From Swiss-Prot:
Upper classification of the organism: Eukaryota, Metazoa, Chordata, Craniata, Vertebrata
Root EC class: transferase
Record-listed Phosphoserine modification sites: S7
Keywords: Catecholamine biosynthesis, Methyltransferase, Phosphoprotein, S-adenosyl-L-methionine, Transferase
Keyword Hydrolase: no
GO BP field: epinephrine biosynthetic process; methylation
Catalytically driven reaction(s): phenylethanolamine + S-adenosyl-L-methionine = N-methylphenylethanolamine + S-adenosyl-L-homocysteine + H(+); (R)-noradrenaline + S-adenosyl-L-methionine = (R)-adrenaline + S-adenosyl-L-homocysteine + H(+); (R)-normetanephrine + S-adenosyl-L-methionine = (R)-metanephrine + S-adenosyl-L-homocysteine + H(+); (R)-octopamine + S-adenosyl-L-methionine = (R)-synephrine + S-adenosyl-L-homocysteine + H(+)
One MF annotation (Gene Ontology) recorded for this entry: phenylethanolamine N-methyltransferase activity
Identification of the protein by name: Phenylethanolamine N-methyltransferase
Organism: Sus scrofa
InterPro entries xrefs: NNMT/PNMT/TEMT_CS (IPR025820), NNMT_TEMT_trans (IPR000940), SAM-dep_methyltransferase (IPR053384), SAM-dependent_MTases_sf (IPR029063)
Binding site for S-adenosyl-L-methionine: Y35, Y40, G79, S80, Y85, D101, N106, D158, V159, A181
Domain of life: Eukaryota
Entry function: Catalyzes the transmethylation of nonepinephrine (noradrenaline) to form epinephrine (adrenaline), using S-adenosyl-L-methionine as the methyl donor. Other substrates include phenylethanolamine, octopamine and normetanephrine.
E.C. code: 2.1.1.28
């Protein structure tokens, strides 16, 4: 669903599965700036209305981190895409953050922002909004400074491999928490592949650790420049079942219906889900 915050992270690499190989090939045409324009500039990037999709996602994340239960030392963002908003509330709770993406162009886009280089996408509206809803009196500059300081590395990832980060990864493993936004459904050719990808990333998480998963509901395609990318449509119950099969207790699962004025023709998304799940001890 390129709809709202997706990080459609092209986390599929060519391997023995022809469906996954086709996904990986399609993502070679992914244009990060077009994706950002479609989803993070107005109208979807308008954060002034509390009913908008952007405020909803940021609120879900902020409220979950405000519980104090999702914390630790190391967090991995799975399939970051070219976006950083999904970590704005997380960065106060983890001192070592790893961002990941299959596509080099997305990793380069993230690097521009982290290094504060000219031409980097401006996330300050998102940072300001997070500071507002968290209510700690923090400035957006302080928020962004903290996030930049705590992102220690940007790594390649392939969620369709049993070891998504490869062997000898530089990320501290197992992580205390995972975040993933608009990745798994956007890079999986079918529901079985989605389930396997979820199983694979779960190996990166310690027992008792937390997964915050954001994704598209009932979406089959989205645009990112010249690329028209297929998405496996999932419903709320399928997400819940997949999490249970991967060994999670679902702590919270919320859904958002995409309003008509935000259905802008860049995808066919019907809604968004936010899941907070905890990996069962012993899994």
């Amino acid at each position: 669903m390129s709809g709202t915050g997706q990080s459609h992270a092209a986390d599929a690499a060519p391997d023995s599965d022809p469906g996954q190989a086709a996904v990986a090939l399609a993502y070679q045409h992914f244009e990060p700036r077009a994706y950002l324009r479609n989803n993070y500039a107005p109208p979807r990037g308008d954060l002034s209305s509390p009913d908008g999709v952007g405020p909803w996602k940021l609120r879900c994340l902020a409220q979950t981190f405000a519980t104090g239960e999702v914390s630790g030392r190391a967090l991995i963002d799975i399939g970051s895409g070219p976006t950083i908003y999904q970590l704005l509330s997380a960065c106060a709770h983890f001192e070592d953050i790893t961002m990941t993406d299959f596509l080099e162009v997305n990793r380069q886009e993230l690097g521009l922002w982290l290094r504060e280089e000219p031409g980097a996408f401006d996330w300050s509206v998102y940072s300001q909004h997070v500071c507002l809803i968290e209510g700690k009196g923090e400035s957006c500059q302080e928020k962004e400074r903290q996030l930049r300081a705590r992102v220690k590395r940007i790594l390649p990832i392939d969620v369709h491999q049993p070891q998504p980060l490869g062997t000898g990864s530089l990320a501290p493993l197992p992580a205390d928490a995972l975040v993933s936004a608009f990745c798994l459904e956007a890079v999986s050719p079918d529901l079985a592949s989605f389930q396997r990808a979820l199983d694979h990333i779960t190996t990166l998480l310690r027992s008792g650790g937390h997964l915050l998963l954001i994704g598209a509901l009932e979406e089959s395609w989205y645009l990112a420049g010249e690329a028209r990318l297929a998405v496996v449509p999932v419903c709320e119950e399928e997400v819940r079942e997949a999490l249970a099969r991967s060994g999670y207790e679902v702590r919270d699962l919320r859904t958002y219906v995409m309003p008509a004025h935000l259905r802008t023709g860049v995808d066919d998304v019907k809604g968004i889900f936010f899941a907070w799940a905890q990996k069962k001890v012993g899994v």
